Swiss-Prot record:
Pfam families: 4PPT_N (PF17837), ACPS (PF01648). It catalyses: apo-[ACP] + CoA = holo-[ACP] + adenosine 3',5'-bisphosphate + H(+). Catalyzes the transfer of the 4'-phosphopantetheine moiety from coenzyme A to a serine residue in the acyl-carrier domain of carboxylic acid reductase Car, thus converting apo-Car to fully active holo-Car. Is probably also responsible for the activation of other proteins with phosphopantetheine attachment sites. This is 4'-phosphopantetheinyl transferase Npt. It is an enzyme of class 2 (transferase). Its EC number is 2.7.8.7. The gene is npt. It comes from Nocardia iowensis.
């Protein structure tokens, strides 16, 4: 599924059913040695997907460490993103010569828990939710797009980005009660000076998909 919302040049892999014999890379085991089983499965599954995607780029199946704020440490010359939710793990990677950053996120297609929306959204976003006639869980889609935005932002800035510091707008290209797809635009509301020598960040554009009970969002920033 995730590959349908990523551009050419980005490789991806996803895992819906967790193989019982799947094990952590030996060099990653210490990172989850004290983790509960669910956390272990999410960690191992997402990094398994990462190595499958790296292979499609022609990269070796290396260990993927954890950096500041838990961000994955990719091989030199590679950018990427990991995501997981109940029943789903995925990774997307690309060569840095083609894309400056990638951010993906996955969420269950269900409404946000009570009280969460106000803490993750801006007034214009809540107004859009009120006035948009759709059977889709657009509140969770908004949250998912904010998460992908942060994942694309962090590697280029090494700075926190709050939910209130990005304004997300959506285009719905197709939608029914339980599936849909379209695009989104993330306008960044804080200075976006970067650490890669590139132009400052002003906004991100991405795509979204709702299918098989999941919401997926993806940004590939060139």
């Amino acid at each position: 599924m995730i590959e349908t919302i990523l551009p050419a040049g980005v490789e991806s892999a996803e895992l819906l059913e967790y193989p019982e014999d799947l094990k952590a890379h030996p060099a990653e085991e210490h990172l989850i040695a004290k983790s509960v089983e669910k956390r272990r499965r999410d960690f191992i599954g997402a990094r398994h997907c990462a190595r499958l995607a790296l292979a499609e780029l022609g990269e070796p199946p290396v260990a993927i460490g954890k950096g500041e704020r838990g961000a994955p440490i990719w091989p030199r010359g590679v950018v990427g993103s990991l995501t997981h939710c109940d029943g789903y793990r995925a990774a997307a990677v690309a060569h840095k010569m083609r894309f400056r950053s990638i951010g993906i996120d996955a969420e269950p297609h269900a409404t946000l828990p009570e009280g969460v929306l106000d803490s993750v959204s801006l007034p214009p976003e809540r107004e859009w939710l009120k006035t948009t006639d759709s059977a889709l869980h657009l509140d969770r889609l908004l949250f998912c797009a904010k998460e992908a935005t942060y994942k694309a932002w962090w590697p280029l800035t090494a700075r926190w980005l709050g939910f209130e510091e990005a304004h997300i707008t959506f285009e719905i290209e197709d939608g029914s009660a339980d599936s849909g797809n379209g695009t989104f635009h993330s306008e960044l509301l804080v200075p976006g000076q970067t650490n890669d020598g590139g132009t400052p960040l002003l906004s991100f554009d991405g795509r979204w998909l709702i299918a098989d009970g999941f919401i997926l969002t993806a940004i590939a920033y060139a």
